[in-house]
Design a protein with these regions (language model features):
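Positively charged n-region of N-terminal signal peptides that target proteins for export
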Residues: 1-4
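C-terminal motif of bacterial Sec signal peptides marking the signal peptidase cleavage site
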Residues: 14-17
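Bacterial signal peptide processing site
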Residues: 19-21
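Start-of-domain marker
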Residues: 23-48, 52-53
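Amphipathic alpha-helical scaffolding segments comprising HEAT/armadillo-like alpha-solenoid repeats
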Residues: 25, 53-63, 86-96
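Solenoid-like repeat scaffolds
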Residues: 31-33, 64-69, 101
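Alpha-helical segments in soluble extracytoplasmic regions
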Residues: 43-51, 57-75, 79-83
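Extracytoplasmic electrostatic interaction patches
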Residues: 71-148
Length: 148
């Protein structure tokens, strides 16, 4: 009987502890990962997969995904920039171009954080890049939007 309980307990710990930290090549940072429940991690995983398929609703939901603020926000920005690199700036630009000004709010900050503090070239060093040089179309989109 004790073996059954121990086996069940082990199964529960393994199941709950199996959060995804890499989803189709998109890295989820340690801080964001640590502050997620298993269910939240599965929702984030689903949003990442759908965003890579250029699902507009998923991209919007990803921007609004609860991240706990501070370092979690930077890590969500890093997820977004990794997605942009994977699907291409042109595709991400097309998606955002279809959104209202209200829906676009927030993306600029996340992208800036992801470029500056993320490791998008996976060399173990923060990139410290700027949107104007890295994603000029998106930069122009945000400039136009703020001038409305």
């Amino acid at each position: 009987m004790i073996k059954v309980y121990l086996s069940l307990l082990l199964f529960v710990f393994l199941f709950v502890g199996c959060k995804s930290e890499n989803v189709q090549g998109i890295i989820i940072g340690d801080t964001l990962l640590a502050h997620q429940s298993f269910g939240e991690n599965q929702k984030l995983k689903e949003l990442i997969i759908k965003s890579l398929k250029k699902d507009e609703v998923a991209i919007l939901k990803l921007k609004d995904f609860p991240n706990g603020g501070a370092a979690g926000s930077y890590e969500l920005g890093y997820i977004i920039t990794q997605i942009i690199y994977k699907i291409g700036e042109d595709e991400f630009y097309k998606t955002l171009s279809g959104f209202s000004s209200e829906e676009i709010k927030g993306f600029e900050g996340y992208i800036n954080a992801g470029l500056e503090y993320g490791d998008n070239d996976y060399d173990g060093i923060m990139d410290n890049k700027r949107m104007k040089q890295e994603f000029p179309k998106l930069y122009d989109l945000f400039e136009i939007d703020t001038n409305k």
